[in-house]
């Protein structure tokens, strides 16, 4: 009997209030790194109706206009009218940054030399994951959820659906048979809209213009349940509808619940914070394992102690799909990847102003030129060392 089950993931648009906060935090991080790549940044953002609060810890030589960066980010997202929930021109922006605690800094302040034994900025555990469900080696439900809200934003920006507004959420339920995607079961899409659009017209346009062009044709089997703005009216949105906070969409940012999460958010954090850099490294490791043909699914856990460079643990789980044992793969990971914090920064070239782009539509599974953790440049070496044939996805 086939193992038949449903699995669901969600995403949110760049105009969702929590994502507004994430993008402001990462825009500030990028501006700082452009001037001082060795800065220590933990930039948190709160946004509500007409108000943005910037707080956290920043130690830098950079001279940054934080208020203008916040306004520019809100404008780029599309909040240029008070009717949308916040207006970049008129919102209040409060700045309350402190410097990094010297107790923390003493363990990580070797950033300017070539010593790769810079300690981790905190303790913690991080996960990386990859699977062969999509060419990008991502779980299908989160991949499709991201593409839906990306398309919503695209149609809003180019004016094809002029009544769309920045805030939106998506959710995709996929039916799996024997562990493989079989068909799309349910698609939910809720989008903020202008007050004068009638609900039937909105639903028809969303289904025909956003949802159907996004779904893979080979997974459209039978009747799919389309739930578009299922509560009806969605005029009040963005930071007016809900208070936005940095770091509240950590499952959207990663694998949509298909893999565990260590709990640490990404946005606003410089790469000395292993919450971010080690999660990126975990994705890099897992993706190369799958691309190498060592397994069709790979989960990596890595953990750290504050002030200590070497990971306290490295674990690989291939869920029985490995062509060699998990112990062998773990040994290969330790041999081919430097998972010390500064080793990760060097390996993935993370001292660059590349982070605002990560803050909406997922940190993983997007083959952007800046996203070094999506490369599969270690796959051939892993395959050769393990004695297996790599997949066709090696790049």
Swiss-Prot record:
SUPFAM superfamilies per the UniProt record, alphabetical = S-adenosylmethionine synthetase
What EC number(s) has UniProt assigned to this enzyme? Answer: 2.5.1.6
The record lists L-methionine as bound by 57, 100, 242, 273
Which reaction is the catalytic activity of this chain? L-methionine + ATP + H2O = S-adenosyl-L-methionine + phosphate + diphosphate
Cite the binding residues for Mg(2+).
18
Record function comment:
Catalyzes the formation of S-adenosylmethionine (AdoMet) from methionine and ATP. The overall synthetic reaction is composed of two sequential steps, AdoMet formation and the subsequent tripolyphosphate hydrolysis which occurs prior to release of AdoMet from the enzyme.
Q: Where in the cell is it found?
A: Cytoplasm
Any one biological process term the GO annotation gives: S-adenosylmethionine biosynthetic process
Source species, please?
Burkholderia lata (strain ATCC 17760 / DSM 23089 / LMG 22485 / NCIMB 9086 / R18194 / 383)
Q: How does it assemble?
A: Homotetramer; dimer of dimers.
What's the protein called, per UniProt?
Answer: S-adenosylmethionine synthase
| Annotated region (Flexible loop), positions in chain | 100-110
Question: What domain of life?
Answer: Bacteria
């Amino acid at each position: 009997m086939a193992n038949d089950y449903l699995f669901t993931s969600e995403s949110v648009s760049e105009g969702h209030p929590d994502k507004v906060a994430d993008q402001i935090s990462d825009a500030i991080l990028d501006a700082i790194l452009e001037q001082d790549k060795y800065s220590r940044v933990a930039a948190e953002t709160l946004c509500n109706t007409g108000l943005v609060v910037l707080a956290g810890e920043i130690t830098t030589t950079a001279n940054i206009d934080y208020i203008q960066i916040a306004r520019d980010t809100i404008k780029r997202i599309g909040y240029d009218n008070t009717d949308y929930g916040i207006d970049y021109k008129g919102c209040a922006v409060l700045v309350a940054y402190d410097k990094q605690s010297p107790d923390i800094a003493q363990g990580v302040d070797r950033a300017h030399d070539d010593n790769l034994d810079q300690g981790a900025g905190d303790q913690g555990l991080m996960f990386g994951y990859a699977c062969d469900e999509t060419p990008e080696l991502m779980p299908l439900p989160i991949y499709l959820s991201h593409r839906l809200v990306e398309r919503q934003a695209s149609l809003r920006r180019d004016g094809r659906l002029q009544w769309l507004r920045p805030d939106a959420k998506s959710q995709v339920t996929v039916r799996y048979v024997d562990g493989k995607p079989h068909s799309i079961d349910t698609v939910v899409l809720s989008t903020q809209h202008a007050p004068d659009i009638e609900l039937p017209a909105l639903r028809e346009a969303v289904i025909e213009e956003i949802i159907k062009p996004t779904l893979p044709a080979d997974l459209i089997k039978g009747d799919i349940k389309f739930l578009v703005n299922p509560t009806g009216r969605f005029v009040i949105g963005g930071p007016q509808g809900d208070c936005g906070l940095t770091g509240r969409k950590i499952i959207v940012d990663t694998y949509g619940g298909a893999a565990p999460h260590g709990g640490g958010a990404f946005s606003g954090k410089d790469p000395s914070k292993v919450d971010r850099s080690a999660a990126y490294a975990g994705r890099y490791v897992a993706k190369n394992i799958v691309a190498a043909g060592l397994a069709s699914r790979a989960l990596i856990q890595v953990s750290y102690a504050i002030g200590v460079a070497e990971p306290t643990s490295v674990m690989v789980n291939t869920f029985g799909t490995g062509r060699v044992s998990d112990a062998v793969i773990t040994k290969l990971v330790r041999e081919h990847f430097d998972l010390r914090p500064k080793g990760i920064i060097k390996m993935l070239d993370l001292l660059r102003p590349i982070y605002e782009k990560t803050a909406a539509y997922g940190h993983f599974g997007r083959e952007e030129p800046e996203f070094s953790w999506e490369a599969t440049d270690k796959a051939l070496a892993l395959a050769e060392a393990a004695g297996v044939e790599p997949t066709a996805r090696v790049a």
